[in-house]
Amino acid sequence: MEFALGQAAARPNAPMSLAQPIGLEALPTPALVLERGAMERNMRKMADHLQRSDKGFRPHSKTHKCPTIAALQMDMGAAGVCAAKISEAAIMLAAGIPSVLITSPIATFAKARALNALLAQYPEHQLLMVIDSDQGLAALQNALDAESRLGLLV
Protein backbone atom coordinates (compact mmCIF):
# COMPACT_ATOMS: atom_id res chain seq x y z
CA MET A 1 0.00 0.00 0.00
CA GLU A 2 2.81 2.43 0.82
CA PHE A 3 4.29 1.92 -2.65
CA ALA A 4 0.99 2.72 -4.37
CA LEU A 5 0.34 5.75 -2.17
CA GLY A 6 3.88 7.01 -2.72
CA GLN A 7 3.54 6.73 -6.49
CA ALA A 8 0.15 8.44 -6.48
CA ALA A 9 1.34 11.28 -4.24
CA ALA A 10 4.47 11.89 -6.31
CA ARG A 11 2.63 11.90 -9.63
CA PRO A 12 -1.12 12.26 -9.03
CA ASN A 13 -2.05 12.63 -12.71
CA ALA A 14 0.40 10.13 -14.18
CA PRO A 15 -0.45 6.58 -15.17
CA MET A 16 0.60 4.06 -12.57
CA SER A 17 1.28 0.52 -13.72
CA LEU A 18 -0.05 -2.23 -11.52
CA ALA A 19 2.24 -4.92 -12.92
CA GLN A 20 1.79 -6.82 -9.68
CA PRO A 21 -1.82 -7.07 -8.51
CA ILE A 22 -2.61 -5.26 -5.30
CA GLY A 23 -5.64 -5.65 -3.08
CA LEU A 24 -8.45 -3.15 -3.26
CA GLU A 25 -7.60 -1.96 0.25
CA ALA A 26 -4.15 -0.90 -1.02
CA LEU A 27 -5.44 1.01 -4.04
CA PRO A 28 -5.25 4.80 -3.58
CA THR A 29 -8.65 6.24 -4.33
CA PRO A 30 -10.21 7.73 -6.26
CA ALA A 31 -8.61 5.64 -8.97
CA LEU A 32 -9.41 4.96 -12.60
CA VAL A 33 -8.50 1.32 -13.15
CA LEU A 34 -8.81 -0.13 -16.62
CA GLU A 35 -7.26 -2.52 -19.10
CA ARG A 36 -5.54 -0.13 -21.46
CA GLY A 37 -5.48 -2.44 -24.47
CA ALA A 38 -9.24 -3.00 -24.32
CA MET A 39 -9.88 0.71 -23.84
CA GLU A 40 -7.73 1.64 -26.85
CA ARG A 41 -9.41 -1.02 -29.04
CA ASN A 42 -12.84 0.34 -28.10
CA MET A 43 -11.75 3.92 -28.72
CA ARG A 44 -10.27 2.99 -32.11
CA LYS A 45 -13.42 1.10 -33.10
CA MET A 46 -15.60 4.13 -32.31
CA ALA A 47 -13.23 6.58 -34.03
CA ASP A 48 -13.12 4.40 -37.16
CA HIS A 49 -16.92 4.09 -37.21
CA LEU A 50 -17.35 7.85 -36.96
CA GLN A 51 -14.76 8.46 -39.66
CA ARG A 52 -16.50 6.01 -42.02
CA SER A 53 -19.77 7.83 -41.29
CA ASP A 54 -18.10 11.17 -42.03
CA LYS A 55 -18.80 12.38 -38.49
CA GLY A 56 -16.56 14.26 -36.12
CA PHE A 57 -16.53 13.73 -32.39
CA ARG A 58 -15.77 15.59 -29.19
CA PRO A 59 -15.99 13.17 -26.25
CA HIS A 60 -16.98 14.32 -22.79
CA SER A 61 -14.15 14.01 -20.28
CA LYS A 62 -16.53 13.72 -17.31
CA THR A 63 -16.58 9.95 -17.73
CA HIS A 64 -12.85 9.61 -17.11
CA LYS A 65 -11.56 13.06 -15.96
CA CYS A 66 -8.16 11.92 -17.17
CA PRO A 67 -5.91 14.07 -19.40
CA THR A 68 -4.02 10.96 -20.56
CA ILE A 69 -7.22 9.44 -21.95
CA ALA A 70 -8.25 12.80 -23.43
CA ALA A 71 -4.90 12.93 -25.26
CA LEU A 72 -5.52 9.43 -26.65
CA GLN A 73 -8.94 10.56 -27.84
CA MET A 74 -7.29 13.51 -29.57
CA ASP A 75 -4.73 11.18 -31.17
CA MET A 76 -7.64 9.14 -32.56
CA GLY A 77 -9.18 12.16 -34.24
CA ALA A 78 -11.34 13.90 -31.65
CA ALA A 79 -11.90 17.58 -32.37
CA GLY A 80 -11.34 18.25 -28.68
CA VAL A 81 -12.99 17.25 -25.44
CA CYS A 82 -15.93 18.48 -23.41
CA ALA A 83 -15.73 19.41 -19.74
CA ALA A 84 -18.65 20.07 -17.42
CA LYS A 85 -17.08 22.93 -15.47
CA ILE A 86 -14.41 25.62 -15.75
CA SER A 87 -12.20 23.76 -13.25
CA GLU A 88 -12.34 20.56 -15.32
CA ALA A 89 -11.54 22.53 -18.48
CA ALA A 90 -8.52 24.06 -16.71
CA ILE A 91 -7.10 20.60 -16.01
CA MET A 92 -7.47 19.56 -19.65
CA LEU A 93 -5.93 22.80 -20.93
CA ALA A 94 -3.02 22.51 -18.49
CA ALA A 95 -2.38 19.00 -19.79
CA GLY A 96 -2.10 20.32 -23.35
CA ILE A 97 -5.53 19.44 -24.74
CA PRO A 98 -5.86 22.13 -27.45
CA SER A 99 -9.65 22.47 -27.62
CA VAL A 100 -12.15 22.23 -24.76
CA LEU A 101 -15.91 22.84 -24.78
CA ILE A 102 -17.43 23.72 -21.39
CA THR A 103 -20.91 22.18 -21.41
CA SER A 104 -22.44 23.83 -18.33
CA PRO A 105 -23.54 27.42 -18.93
CA ILE A 106 -22.45 30.09 -16.47
CA ALA A 107 -24.63 32.91 -15.27
CA THR A 108 -22.58 34.78 -12.69
CA PHE A 109 -19.95 37.47 -12.95
CA ALA A 110 -17.60 35.49 -10.65
CA LYS A 111 -17.68 32.43 -12.93
CA ALA A 112 -17.21 34.63 -15.99
CA ARG A 113 -14.14 36.24 -14.35
CA ALA A 114 -12.74 32.76 -13.63
CA LEU A 115 -13.29 31.91 -17.28
CA ASN A 116 -11.54 35.14 -18.31
CA ALA A 117 -8.51 34.16 -16.22
CA LEU A 118 -8.43 30.77 -17.94
CA LEU A 119 -8.61 32.41 -21.37
CA ALA A 120 -5.70 34.68 -20.44
CA GLN A 121 -3.65 31.74 -19.18
CA TYR A 122 -4.17 29.64 -22.34
CA PRO A 123 -4.52 32.08 -25.26
CA GLU A 124 -3.15 29.53 -27.75
CA HIS A 125 -5.90 27.02 -26.93
CA GLN A 126 -9.46 26.96 -28.23
CA LEU A 127 -12.03 27.34 -25.47
CA LEU A 128 -15.72 27.06 -26.25
CA MET A 129 -18.79 27.08 -24.04
CA VAL A 130 -22.52 26.73 -24.27
CA ILE A 131 -24.72 29.67 -23.38
CA ASP A 132 -28.44 29.48 -22.74
CA SER A 133 -29.57 32.79 -21.27
CA ASP A 134 -29.36 36.54 -21.57
CA GLN A 135 -28.05 36.55 -17.99
CA GLY A 136 -25.11 34.35 -19.01
CA LEU A 137 -24.36 36.51 -22.02
CA ALA A 138 -24.43 39.65 -19.87
CA ALA A 139 -22.06 38.06 -17.34
CA LEU A 140 -19.61 37.23 -20.14
CA GLN A 141 -19.89 40.70 -21.69
CA ASN A 142 -19.15 42.34 -18.34
CA ALA A 143 -16.36 40.01 -17.25
CA LEU A 144 -14.29 39.15 -20.32
CA ASP A 145 -11.38 41.32 -21.38
CA ALA A 146 -11.53 42.76 -24.90
CA GLU A 147 -8.69 40.50 -26.07
CA SER A 148 -10.31 37.32 -24.71
CA ARG A 149 -11.45 34.88 -27.39
CA LEU A 150 -14.25 32.48 -26.50
CA GLY A 151 -16.35 30.38 -28.86
CA LEU A 152 -20.03 30.31 -27.92
CA LEU A 153 -22.63 27.69 -28.77
CA VAL A 154 -26.20 28.88 -28.32
Residue ranges and their predicted role:
Residues 2-21:
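Acidic, low-complexity proline/glycine-rich segments
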Residues 5, 20-24, 49, 79, ...:
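Bulky hydrophobic/aromatic packing residues
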Residues 15-19, 38-69, 82:
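N-terminal glycine-rich anion-binding loops that anchor highly charged ligand groups
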Residues 15-34:
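Generic N-terminal amphipathic, Lys/Arg-enriched alpha-helix
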Residues 30-32, 53-56, 72-75:
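A short, structure-level motif marking secondary-structure boundaries and short turns
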Residues 34-37, 128:
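Short, surface-exposed alpha-helical recognition segments that flank or form part
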Residues 60-154:
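Active-site-proximal beta-alpha core segment in soluble small-molecule metabolic enzymes
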